[in-house]
């Protein structure tokens, strides 16, 4: 099995704040993994440690079999990273930015990078500071993809993009994955985008993995059980993830299986969005069993 990212007891502290708290995770290569969680869950911290920008406070991490802190030079030539704030030098032109990419990356594909910025109508002589948010996002993604990476790590790549620009970027990402097959970790809180492109889902809460699994398997293994008299129903055949109370109805997200009954309850498959939201909300309240 090709494990591209593996952590064991990974911790990261900033003063008294623990951003990662003994995080254990193993991701198989060749997939697009969606990393989701509330603000402060540790998503950005995990990606920054994975590319060697921060040193962990404890535990172990391996990316493509390498230690990001100790083997940073060797690792960076094999991965592409787009940070959340897409830090590009505003004084450089698009062409100069690509030239820097060419000089710093031994696997750089200049023909591909030039073709990509041309496709998106980005003049090589135009200053980066004059580009729109969507155009800067495309330049940042070009820098990552021009390396022809084995692994691509994207931290909120569609944040602040308009709907058309967001859709174009995601379609381009899917095309790259289909053509070149890099492993991808996509951090995003836009659940529709995660559902559109991700094959594997990791829900991160409080610096720990709440659940990790293939999207199809998560959908198969979760159901919503709702009805007016649900409080007395036996749900011992599964784990209750979340309970929502309405005026006359109770709905439970259940990890497991439940059979319909004649007491007015309804059982249906949960959508991926309902599963993700259920896990995130369950961390804010005690779940009655």
Stretches with model-predicted labels:
Residues 36-38:
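The feature captures the beta-strand-to-loop junction immediately N-terminal to the Walker
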Residues 51:
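Helix-to-loop junction immediately C-terminal to a conserved catalytic motif
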Residues 152-156, 161:
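Catalytic Walker B motif of ABC-type/P-loop ATPase nucleotide-binding domains
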């Amino acid at each position: 099995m090709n494990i591209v990212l593996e952590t064991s007891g990974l911790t990261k502290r900033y003063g008294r704040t623990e951003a990662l708290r003994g995080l254990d995770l193993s991701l198989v290569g060749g997939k697009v993994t969606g990393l989701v969680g509330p603000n402060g869950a540790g998503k950005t911290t995990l990606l920054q440690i994975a590319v060697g920008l921060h040193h962990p406070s404890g535990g172990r991490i391996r990316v493509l079999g390498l230690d990001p802190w100790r083997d940073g030079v060797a690792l960076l030539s094999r991965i592409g990273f787009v940070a959340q704030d897409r830090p590009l030098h505003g004084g450089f032109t698009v062409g100069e930015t690509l030239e820097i990419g060419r000089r710093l990356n031994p696997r750089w594909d200049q023909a591909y990078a030039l073709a990509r910025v041309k496709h998106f109508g980005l003049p090589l002589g135009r200053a980066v500071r004059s580009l729109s948010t969507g155009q800067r996002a495309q330049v940042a993604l070009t820098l990552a993809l021009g390396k022809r990476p084995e692994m691509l790590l994207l931290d909120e790549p569609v944040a602040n993009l308009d709907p058309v620009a967001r859709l174009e970027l995601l379609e381009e990402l899917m095309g790259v994955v289909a053509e070149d097959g890099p492993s991808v970790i996509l951090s995003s809180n836009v659940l529709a985008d995660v559902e559109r492109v991700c094959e594997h889902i990791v829900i991160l809460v409080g610096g720990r993995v709440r659940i990790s699994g293939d999207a199809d398997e998560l959908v198969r293994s979760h159901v919503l059980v709702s009805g007016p008299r649900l409080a007395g129903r036996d749900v011992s055949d599964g784990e209750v993830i979340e309970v929502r109370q309405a005026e006359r109805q109770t709905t439970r997200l259940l990890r497991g299986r439940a059979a319909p009954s004649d007491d007015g309850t309804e059982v249906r498959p949960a959508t991926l969005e309902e599963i993700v939201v259920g896990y995130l909300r369950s961390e804010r309240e005690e779940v009655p069993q």
